[in-house]
UniProtKB/Swiss-Prot annotation, chains A, B:
Family named by the database record: Belongs to the glyceraldehyde-3-phosphate dehydrogenase family.
Organism of derivation: Pyrobaculum neutrophilum (strain DSM 2338 / JCM 9278 / NBRC 100436 / V24Sta)
Record-given protein name: Glyceraldehyde-3-phosphate dehydrogenase
Binding residue positions for D-glyceraldehyde 3-phosphate: 139-141, 195-196
Active site residues per record: 140 (nucleophile)
Subcellular location: Cytoplasm
Domain of life: Archaea
InterPro entries: DapB_N, GlycerAld/Erythrose_P_DH, GlycerAld_3-P_DH_AS, GlycerAld_3-P_DH_cat, GlycerAld_3-P_DH_NAD(P)-bd, Glyceraldehyde-3-P_DH_2_arc, NAD(P)-bd_dom_sf
EC category name: oxidoreductase
Keyword NADP: yes
Main localization, broad class: cytoplasm
Gene Ontology cellular-component terms listed: cytoplasm
Length: 344, 344
């Protein structure tokens, strides 16, 4: 059993913790919280040992939570640390704590690529995290793009260049202070947005440019993709590629999937934890070929898409399972769509 | 003085009416309203003769508005009719009324292209409406795209193909029943959206594909454009083209234009009627060249962008002014941005 310490039990960390619990080859060593808020109490109720920073111990005690120890105690109790701290805090934690212990650490996409030795996506480069000390699971949008592009190339559809146009959700559901409201915000106004270069930390040779705007939505990101292929391919070959690629879901308008909200409604109806949808939701009706051009729209659930990637990153680091067996195990344990999927 | 009858005094019609009032070569013959609501009362307070449909006369009287006559009386009192009815109602009006009178009619972009002999954009094909009986001013998004592409070609920047990705405003500010709220809706899920073919009703040979999603915004549409040019051009040449093209405004992030809402705030600060912004608002920072590729983002104010186009369409039909003199006269009378603009 791999003992996993989760540093940062927020939007991503709490989901990874629950995903770890669903595995039979790993378990939670503990989770680190900075504030003794309702999320900390949820961690306690889940039975997770709750650690905190040295200067927060008294605060936790006052709030009725007895900390299991400090961050360094958590690192010592873990075989691997998953850092899901807010942007840039992961790097601070590395300098302050992780460098002093000989434990592998997985960072999230909020950190710059050079925080780690390798940027990770299970479909694209599972093997590259093997034995690494520092691994970074790329961010939600980058994960979505990487899955779509890798699905194509794994299935014989060659890519000449990808131009992706992103309508980003402005905030997560719980972020009550973030906007926009009734506005569309270039994010950034310059081209490219960071997503293109970020994809290239994994798919090093892909010709990709991305543009992004933020919109008043908390539910999911939406991508409009224009991809030039290396020749003309039948649309059915592209659809078939998506249909058999794990962690891609084909949403049909005819089946009621007319928008991102309907994808999340489906997740809620399925009883998925927190109404999460870790698959890339490709709108099947949008998949269009036009000579050697491919168009498609897809949704990316920013809160959950990286969760299965973190689970696979753990197995990849320790080399306990090969790529496809890990992906399949993760998907089954998290009850992702497995019907028609080809694992290997 | 050209006497202009406005059929449909809603979002577009009321703006065209005010724009007509600002001209010294045309005047309002009257406006047609179907409901005696607050907009009808605004029309009365503006001093416009208010006409209605035959079966609505009593309703208007009960509401305290004495109609000046019926739609046929309005047609008779006009030299030209601008039909700004809801989608498809323009065509019904044509079949029911306009065909029986020998007066030119201008339709809006909500109607299909074949309602008219020519689709119109002042920059692109001003001369083609000359002497026509039925003219159609294309819709807001189509007008925005047509201006941007025409600005490039008029200034020596050749276009190979245009791929435009649109985050549409979900509703106008007054449309209280329309959505989405907290959702991104493929609009449509199929590719292309109608905008590409609609641009081709004016720029017949342009290779264009468009995709669109609707977002929870009432303020403006946002376009992300990817344009392949016929060779590499310096970015400055593109910026210069936009800078001197009438009805295109370059919004600098450094000057505070960080989003669409800031563009509208500027219009409000300028004291523009209804806070309108009929110019295409190009985010200067987004204009990027990359080999022969051009990227940019721009906002399109759906409520007002077609207003100056309708004024020019009237002059074009009657041949009272050549293209650039009409555009300049319209822009000055409506107090659009004229600094640095080249009219001719």
């Amino acid at each position: 059993m791999i003992r996993v310490g989760i540093v940062g039990y927020g939007t991503i960390g709490k989901r990874i913790a629950d995903a770890v619990v669903a595995q039979d080859d790993m378990k939670i060593a503990g989770v680190l919280k900075v504030s003794p808020d309702y999320e900390a109490k949820v961690a306690v109720s889940r039975g997770f040992p709750v650690y905190t920073l040295p200067d927060r111990v008294e605060k936790f005690k006052k709030a009725g939570i007895e900390p299991a120890g400090t961050i360094e105690d958590l690192i010592k109790a873990s075989d691997v640390v998953v850092d899901a701290s807010p942007e840039d805090v992961g790097r601070e934690n590395k300098e302050k704590y992780y460098q002093r212990y000989d434990k592998p650490v997985i960072f999230q996409g909020g950190e710059e690529a050079d925080v780690a030795e390798v940027s990770f996506n299970a479909l694209a480069n599972y093997e590259e995290a093997r034995g690494k000390r520092y691994v970074r699971v790329v961010s939600c949008n980058t994960t979505g793009i990487t899955r779509v592009l890798t699905s194509l190339t794994l299935n014989g559809v060659g890519i000449k260049k990808a131009r992706i146009f992103i309508a980003r959700r402005g905030a997560d559901p719980k972020e009550h202070k973030k906007g926009p409201i009734n506005d569309v915000v270039p994010n950034p106004a310059t081209v490219p947005s960071h997503h293109g270069p970020d994809v290239q930390t994994i798919l090093r040779n892909v010709d990709i440019v991305t543009m992004a705007v933020a919109v008043p939505v908390t539910i999911m990101h939406m991508h409009m993709a224009y991809i030039e292929l290396d020749s003309a391919y039948p649309k059915d070959q592209v659809i078939e590629a998506f249909a058999k690629t794990p962690r891609i879901f084909l949403a049909d308008v005819g089946a009621g999937f007319q928008s991102l909200a309907q994808v999340i409604e489906y997740a809620r109806d399925l009883g998925r934890p927190r109404g999460d949808f870790p698959e890339v939701a490709v709108f099947r009706d949008s998949v269009t070929t036009h000579g050697n051009e491919l168009y498609l729209m897809y949704g990316v659930h920013q809160e959950s898409i990286v969760v299965p990637e973190n689970i696979d990153a753990i197995r990849s680091i320790f080399g306990t399972l090969p790529k496809w067996r890990s992906i399949e195990k993760t998907d089954k344990s998290l009850k992702l769509t497995t019907e028609g999927k080809r694992y290997g």
